[in-house]
Amino acid sequence: MKSLWLHGAAIVTATGSDPEQAGILLEAGRIARIGGAAPRGVEVVDCAGLTLTPGLIDAHVHLGMASPILDSVGYGMSVAEIAADMFANCARTLRTGFTTVRDCGGIDAGLVGVVASGKIAGPRIVQCGPIHCQTGGHGHYASEWEPAGLWSGQEIPGLRTLAMLADNPDEMRRNARESFRRGADFLKLCVTGGVISKHDKLTDTQFTSEEIAAAVAEATARGTYVTVHAHNVAGIRNAVLAGVRCVEHGTGIDEETAALMAERGVSLVPTLAAVEAVIRNGLGLPSEFAERAAQVRQAMVDGLLAAKAAGVRIGLGSDVIGPDQSRRGEELTLRAAVESPMEALIAATRVNAGLLGLDSEIGTLEVGKRADIVGFAGNPLEDPKLFADPESVVLVLRNGVIVS
């Protein structure tokens, strides 16, 4: 692996320090030095006019849902088409500056393996395998006339399994063990209704405390954790009291619930971009889903602010689904409007790295860290709309190798 000197850019380290003009020396896939002069004989990469940040991390993706939604979950397209869309989505995700992702439901470890091997381009992937849901709950996408016994989670072995059903603690325990057998890094449960749900309401709570606790016990036994999809306070509290360590979406979190999350060390990953995408273009779905998205938009922001005030660790995830996931960076733009551009960037880098347990390796531009670096044409801290524009990402390095 050749050494590189990145020259002429403004550097945003995401450590909390102000941006600075400095060169970066990359050796053996890691950051060897920041500042000083270029060593003799090293290859120089001209980064004049760019802003360099740590590689972005999306803590809530669905790489396996990269096709038209209704066709993809209803046998409306071939396995070959689904696979092609997934592979293209992986490459696009990396190209737009996301060097690491946490997949929150749908892919199998086989996809992780082919990306890690270099057979297809893509980000570093941490994944939960299939979503865990109850019969008729969020994630059970079967039509109402389809017998529940026929549901297999749209399983494509080695590529994609959307969801597994459990209706008692023993079934949850078996499904959790099966997920880990297949290579899951953590577990995700749906504990409330969802925006894109056929059979439930946003106000529904799902899974009993005993069912959630069974999943938590299996994850804890393996040194990992459970995160939950949650759009109402009752579901969030049930999950937190059962021992989960992270909440996705977090719609409607109030002060009391935020305090409980902070006390128990539970993190939050809001997903504003997915809500905006459903409201803006519908994703080819029935109009009722856009109406649901409109219901959660402000409540999710309110939950974020309540959690922030309580001192909850807050990551960043896009949750975008469907054929066009190129604008997942819009999550940073939306967060910048709620907080600040720097806070949004730090959430998408340093905070997310900690949430994934990778903060010793990635998340900041520091000596010794892996050289995952993104170059923006312009300064997204001054113009946060650049985060949402994939064309503004003009340089991507992963492990010290230029990939875009």
Predicted regions and their residues:
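Metal-associated gating/positioning segment near the N- to mid-region
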Residues: L50-S117, T135-A142, E210, A234, ...
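His/Asp/Glu-enriched, well-ordered alpha-helical/loop segment
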Residues: A221, P286-E288, R297-P380
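N-terminal metal-binding scaffold of metallo-dependent hydrolase/deaminase domains
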Residues: M1-P39, L50-L52, P380-D383, V401-I402
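Divalent metal-coordination and catalytic microenvironments
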Residues: A9, I24, G29, G49, ...
